[in-house]
C-alpha cells in the first residue's frame, strides 16, 4: 500500500465532495483522516486524475492506494454514509415544479447516484429511493390527504413518518412514479400495479409499485427488494440450533410437503430462499413458481406468475412437474387447485415447499383441510409446518436492563428467577433514536410425527392437534421469550407480534 504527498497548500474550510460518477469511473474517493485531506484510489489511477482532483479540492492531500475489492467497498460505504444529504434534497425542493420533467423517461438501467438532472421532481424521487435504501426500508408509503402529503418508510416492520413535502407535489410525484413503473398515467379511478428495476449506488433494487384511488388523490406504496441485502442462509434467520438442524434434515427428504406460515411481511419467502440455497447443487433440479420473483437464485429455474395471460400458480406448477424436478417451490398456496397439485406432486416423488397465510402452524393444517384436501392425503404428504414472525432486535449500543413486572411474568408463562431482568429499548444515534436496529425471526416448528399424522388422518380439530404437539414443541411466543431473556429483543416486541396466539 503506497502513500505520498502532493504539493502543500492550505486546507479549505469545507472539503468538496467528488460526484459519485467521477469517483467510480476514475477510481478515487476524496475524504479526510484526522483533519488531513486524503485521496483513496484503486490501482492504476492516471496522473491526470490526481491533477484534476487537486484542482477541484484546492488543497494538498495524501494519496493512498487500495486493492480493487477494498476500494469498491469503501466507495459504496462513503457515498451512502450520510443520509442527511438525501433528506436535504427533499426538503429543499421549491414550490415551482418543471411540469415538462414528467415527460422525460428515466432509463431503467441508469444509476440514480449518477443522475445529473435538475428537474426537482426527479431529484425528489431519486433522493427518496436512496434514503429508503440507506435506512433499509422495506416499503415507501406516499399518502395524500386534504392539506398534507406524507411520506412514510416501513423500517424494521414499523411505519415511520419521514417527510411532509408540499401538498402541491402530490400529483407530480404520483405521475412520475407511474411513468417509471409503466402504468397508465391518465387512469386515476382504478388501482394499478407496476414494477421498476433500477440501480442505486451500484446496488440492484427491484421496486413493486401499487397505486389506489383515495378521497384526495392516489395513494402509492413502493415495496423495495434490495437484492444486496437478502440473507440466504438458514443460520442467519434467527432459528435455534435445534430447529435449524431439523429443517436441514427435512429439506433433504426425497418427497413430501414443507409449509411456512405467517402474516404478510414475516419473512416466509426469505426462509424458502434460504432453504433452497442450502440444498442447491448440480445433482438437483430445483424449480419455482413465484409471484413475484423476489431474488434470483443461480442454478434454480424460477417462473413468474402472470395472471394477465392465465399463468397462475396452478398452471405453472403443472408445467413444472413435466420438467423432471427434484424440488419444487410454490410461492403461495392460494386455492384448492394449487393445493391439490402440490399434494399429488409430493406423493409422486417430489419435495414441495410453499407458504400459507395462516397465523399458526396448526392453522395451516386446518386451512388445507378447509380448502378441500382430503385428510388422508394431507397426513400422507405433510412433513412439517414452520410458523414465523419477525421482531425488531434491540440496539446493542443503547439497550438497558430493567426488572420484570408481575403482569409480565404471568404473560411469559414460565418460571423465572426472582431477580430476572429483561432489556428495554433506549434510543441513540446508532439506531436513529428508536432503540431497535434490524430484525430477527421467532419460530415454531411442528414436525408431523406418527401421532400428529394419525390426528390429521382422523380429522381431529385444531385444539386436539395443539395438545398433541405442545409437550415437545415450544410455541412461537416461547421462542420469542427465550430471545427476550437473551437480550436480543424486548418483551413488548414479542407480545406485539404474537397477541393472536
UniProtKB/Swiss-Prot annotation:
One GO term describing the cellular component: plasma membrane
Disulphide-bonded residues: none
Catalysed reaction equations from the record: ATP + H2O + cellular proteinSide 1 = ADP + phosphate + cellular proteinSide 2
Gene3D superfamilies: 3.30.450.90, P-loop containing nucleotide triphosphate hydrolases (3.40.50.300), Type II secretion system, protein E, N-terminal domain (3.30.300.160)
Location(s) in or outside the cell: Cell inner membrane
Gene symbol of the encoding locus: exeE
Enzyme Commission designation: 7.4.2.8
GO biological process: protein secretion by the type II secretion system
Cited function: ATPase component of the type II secretion system required for the energy-dependent secretion of extracellular factors such as proteases and toxins from the periplasm. Acts as a molecular motor to provide the energy that is required for assembly of the pseudopilus and the extrusion of substrates generated in the cytoplasm.
Residues bound to ATP: 262-269
Residue ranges crossing the lipid bilayer per the database entry: none
SUPFAM superfamilies documented for this protein: EspE N-terminal domain-like, P-loop containing nucleoside triphosphate hydrolases
Subunit structure: Forms homooligomers; most probably hexamers. Interacts with ExeL/GspL.
Signal peptide: none
Protein name: Type II secretion system protein E
Co-factor(s): Zn(2+)
Record bears the keyword Magnesium: no
First-level EC class: translocase
Organism of origin: Aeromonas hydrophila
Record InterPro entries: AAA+_ATPase, GSPE_N1E, P-loop_NTPase, T2SS/T4SS_dom, T2SS_E_N_sf, T2SS_GspE
Superkingdom to which the source organism belongs: Bacteria
Positions annotated to bind Zn(2+): 395, 398, 428, 431
Gene Ontology terms, MF aspect: ATP binding; ATP hydrolysis activity; metal ion binding; protein-exporting ATPase activity
UniProt keyword annotations, A-Z: ATP-binding, Cell inner membrane, Cell membrane, Membrane, Metal-binding, Nucleotide-binding, Protein transport, Translocase, Transport, Zinc
